[in-house]
Amino acid sequence: MKAFTSEKKIAASSEKIFKAFEDPTLLGKWWGPAGFTITSNTFEFKPGGKWSFVMHGPGGNTYPNETIFQKIARPNKVAIRHDSNPHFTVTATIEDIKGGAIIRWHQDFDSEDVAKNIAHIVKPANEQILDKLKALVESTQQVL
């Protein structure tokens, strides 16, 4: 298995969830596992646009990341190619349902061996990312 899929029901519209992708300040609040923060250096939210950022871990470690927005289809899809190690593509699809939306997060690694070796990290990290996104967009204090 070289791909991991998670989904989360969120009590918000697909448009509101999509806005959390297109705004680098908002994206930095939820992208990454629990305890991580993001500093964006370059953010070009368009197909082929670059997103260069640094993840700051809870222990003080920093992780530079280089990505490219492969596909953007407002308000239902964002595909992001991660060109730093490990190499993968994340495709987020957002579907409106009664009472909110479902986001499906599909992370496909280039290497099956790499995916197997880090599955114990990736699976919970993806759930934490979606939990952070849900908390942000469902917050009555956060205006999107």
Q: Residue spans of the language-model regions?
A:
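Short, surface-exposed coil-to-beta transition loops
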Residues: 3-5, 38, 62-66, 87-91
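Hydrophobic pocket/interface hotspot
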Residues: 17-18, 27, 51-53, 69, ...
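Short, highly charged C-terminal tails/helix-capping segments
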Residues: 136-144
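A short, structured loop/turn motif at beta-sheet edges
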Residues: 14-15, 46, 70-75, 93-102
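Hydrophobic ligand-binding cavity/cleft-lining segments
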Residues: 1-37, 42
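Glycine-rich portal/gate segments that line the openings of hydrophobic small-molecule binding cavities
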Residues: 39-81
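Beta-strand/loop substructures that line and gate deep hydrophobic ligand-binding cavities in soluble
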Residues: 79-128, 144
